[in-house]
Amino acid sequence: MLTIPEGILLCFITSGSVLGVLGNGFILHVNCTDCVRQKFSTTGFIFTGLAISRICVICIIISDGYLKLFSPHMVASDAHIIGISYLWIITNHTSTCFATILNLFYFLKIANFSHYIFFCLKRKLNTIFIFLLGCLFISWSVAFPQTVKIFNDKMKHRNTSWKFHLHKSKFIINHILLNLGVIFFCMVAIITSFLLIISLWKHNRKMQLYVSRFKSLNTEVHLKVMKVLISFIILLILHVIGILIETLSFLRYENKLLLILGLNFSSMYPCCHSFILILANNQLKQASLKALKQFKCHKKDKDVRET
């Protein structure tokens, strides 16, 4: 049985995950519709890949969390451990990769630096995207053998009570190698986010010097982008913290509260960031407002028919 705090946190994560799937599903629907109507754009490809991978990440986090809470015997099975590990590697690495590509895309499109390296990167935008997708496949090729190694180590020590403190350094090294791709993508995303924030901040300072009475429209847009980037960094850090908490709960099966807390933190990023993207992107925002209007009209028609 769950305690009251555990039950509240579980309800919170369940409702948040449903909203996260709906938000990412909406992004996927809008971009797939645009793909059918007109030529598939680079941003459409990025948003589609990001939405699909995040829906999968949310489903894996929730399903694995519920199994650990209510059916721990199923989680202990070898087939479940291997299966969920491979699915997690594919979806989590893919989600982080597409989020990094999206950040890099906005950085190269919006930022303004006079350094020649920045201009070289800007000219070779498609090449950089292909390079990052190549890094995604490399991260899979590193993570898959590492998963098998971790699983085999656990199988060897199954009958001799595998203890964390006896293999602390090995445990940390294995998990660093397992998440090497995610660490690389996160570093690139955070660095590009900070550089874009610096560029926008410098631009806003210049605008304040030249435009003292009237607020520039570009300044408002830049402030909105800065808020989106800061929220992205915060959510990404919470996601990493959540995964670390879940890893700690793996070592202490009796602590359900720690597991649910980790699930809440790790699911915030793929769930909340989708709504931030919808509000920040004009195309997605207009589509969401149109969908809300249609829903309200449908509800009114239904109420009229019932009366």
Swiss-Prot record:
Family the UniProt entry places it in: Belongs to the G-protein coupled receptor T2R family.
Protein name: Taste receptor type 2 member 106
InterPro entries: TAS2R
Subcellular location(s) of the protein: Membrane
One GO term describing the cellular component: membrane
Annotated signal peptide: none
Glycosylation site list: 159
Key words, A-Z: G-protein coupled receptor, Glycoprotein, Membrane, Receptor, Sensory transduction, Taste, Transducer, Transmembrane, Transmembrane helix
Function: Putative taste receptor which may play a role in the perception of bitterness.
Cytoplasmic topological domain residue ranges: 29-41, 105-124, 201-227, 279-307
Highest taxon above the source species: Eukaryota
GO molecular function, one term: bitter taste receptor activity
Main location group: membrane
Extracellular compartment segments: 1-7, 63-81, 146-179, 249-257
UniProt-listed GO biological process terms: detection of chemical stimulus involved in sensory perception of bitter taste
Pfam families from the UniProt entry: TAS2R
Organism from which the protein derives: Rattus norvegicus
